Swiss-Prot record:
InterPro entries: Bulb-type_lectin_dom, Bulb-type_lectin_dom_sf, Pan_app, S_locus_glycoprot_dom, SLSG/EP1. GO terms for biological process: rejection of self pollen. Stigma. PANTHER family: BULB-TYPE LECTIN DOMAIN-CONTAINING PROTEIN (PTHR32444), INACTIVE G-TYPE LECTIN S-RECEPTOR-LIKE SERINE_THREONINE-PROTEIN KINASE SRK-RELATED (PTHR32444:SF251). The keyword Disulfide bond applies. Residues 1-31 form the signal peptide. It comes from Brassica oleracea. Residues 34-156 form the Bulb-type lectin domain. The gene is SLSG. Pfam families: B_lectin, PAN_2, S_locus_glycop. This is S-locus-specific glycoprotein S13. Keywords: Disulfide bond, Glycoprotein, Self-incompatibility, Signal.
């Protein structure tokens, strides 16, 4: 019996040691999504943080054509690595020595000389609990007190500092309490995550709108939120497993979207070549599907046709004067150089004017617009007629047969027509030009 017990003890000890060494050797493979103030991530350790649902992973990476290293987040379980956030995109690590840790209640990324190349740079008072960093299930990398999971009390979050991608639950636009404007900036190239030439950014005005730009040159205007969607991207309403929202109040003006089916994935991305795209991934997918891309047609281009004209993909040429208007420069117009736009055939008289109804339109740029949220279309028409500077009006919200009022008091710019997904625009004309 003693021999049996001795053999059993040896076997038990060997089993214990085997399990112990397996745990040590393969520790990085376990799905750990938090980083405490006593831990660190290094390039050499190959350790990563993995979100609880195993969808997102945070760690160090380098692109195929570069020896520089970045800290980023990517989709974990897809066959092709897709990056959604990069911390040090404009200040990469020059070699394979890098450390992410919590120091002084901030996340810091240190290079080979222990110099900080990126930090959350949060200024706080006395701390009552240790700080912890966590990769959440939605891909948000947050820093919080270790005893608080309240999202409103996050000390810092990557969702506030997007790179080129908007994920579900992220917000694109302004936090009016802090003045933070969350916008997208493209990669320099498909293999270079540094800040590129293109941005997608919200501009605050009576009706906030997003602009796709290259530097100061605008390429595309989103159109305002119409209650269902961003009006200049009608394709976005056609995904049944997604809901969209634009919040505008005293605290924020921001767009977001949510997934209603967790089997599908979607993201908005601004490409290094200047396209704003929605990409989707279905359970049967092997690659990301480009659901829509903008600008997709010359009618998507910013101010393609000039003032008082509209773009129609079904006409040739695509630029057309609004009823009651004629080309301002006939020679240029005939040469298909439409940027000078159109002018009225008959001057407005103020007292005897009327309106032509244009259906399925992208509303004009709202720089010179006035918004009244509490009145309907009839009252909107009356107010437009009573203002001799009013050039057009429309509903601000197309839900419930239309509510709210938008009045334009200047030139009507950047208009286009859609097959079925736009909204009614009422343009002021002299009585002689009404049909």
């Amino acid at each position: 019996m003693k021999g049996v017990k001795k053999t059993y003890d040896i076997s038990y000890t060997l089993s214990f040691l085997l399990v112990f060494f397996v745990l040590i050797l393969f520790r990085p493979a376990f799905s750990i999504n938090t980083l405490s103030s006593t831990e660190s991530l290094t390039i050499s350790s190959n350790r990563t943080l993995v979100s609880p649902g195993n969808v997102f992973e945070l760690g160090f990476f380098k692109t195929t054509s570069s020896s520089r290293w970045y800290l980023g987040i990517w989709y974990k379980k897809f066959p092709y690595r897709t990056y959604v956030w990069v911390a040090n995109r404009d200040n990469p690590l020059s070699n394979d020595i890098g450390t992410l840790k919590i120091s002084g209640n901030n996340l810091v990324l240190l290079d080979h000389s222990n110099k900080s190349v990126w930090s959350t740079n949060v200024t706080r008072g006395n701390e009552r609990s240790p700080v912890v960093a966590e990769l959440l299930d939605n891909g948000n990398f947050v820093m919080r007190d270790s005893n608080s999971n309240n999202a409103s009390q996050f000390l810092w979050q990557s969702f506030d500092y997007p790179t080129d991608t908007l994920l579900p639950e992220m917000k694109l636009g302004y936090d009016l309490k802090t003045g933070l404007n969350r916008f997208l900036t493209s990669w320099r190239s498909s293999d270079d995550p540094s800040s590129g030439d293109y941005s997608y950014k919200l501009e605050l005005r009576r009706l906030p709108e997003f602009y796709l730009s290259s530097g100061s040159f605008r390429l595309h205007r989103s159109g305002p939120w119409n209650g269902f969607r961003i009006s200049g991207i009608p394709e976005d309403q056609k995904l049944s497993y997604m809901v969209y929202n634009f919040t505008e109040n005293s605290e924020e003006a921001a767009y977001t979207f949510l997934m209603t089916n967790n089997s599908f994935y979607s993201r908005l991305t601004i490409s290094s070549t200047g396209y704003f795209e929605r990409l989707t991934w279905a359970p049967s997918s092997v690659v990301w599907n480009v659901f829509w891309s903008s600008p997709n047609h010359q009618c998507d281009m910013y101010r393609m046709c000039g003032p008082y004209s509209y773009c129609d993909v079904n006409t040739s040429p695509v630029c057309n004067c609004i009823q009651g208007f004629r080309p301002k420069n006939r020679q240029q117009w005939d040469l298909r150089i439409p940027t000078s736009g159109c002018i009225r055939r008959t001057r407005l008289s103020c007292s005897g004017d009327g309106f032509t109804r244009m259906k399925n339109m992208k509303l004009p740029e709202t720089t010179m617009a006035i918004v009244h949220r509490s009145i309907g279309l009839k009252e909107c028409e009356k107010r437009c007629l009573s203002d001799c500077n009013c050039t057009a009006f429309a509903n601000a919200d197309i839900r419930n047969r239309g509510t709210g009022c938008v009045i334009w008091t200047g030139e009507l710019e950047d208009i286009r027509t859609y097959f079925a997904d736009g909204q009614d625009l009422y343009v002021r004309l002299a009585a002689a030009d009404l049909v």
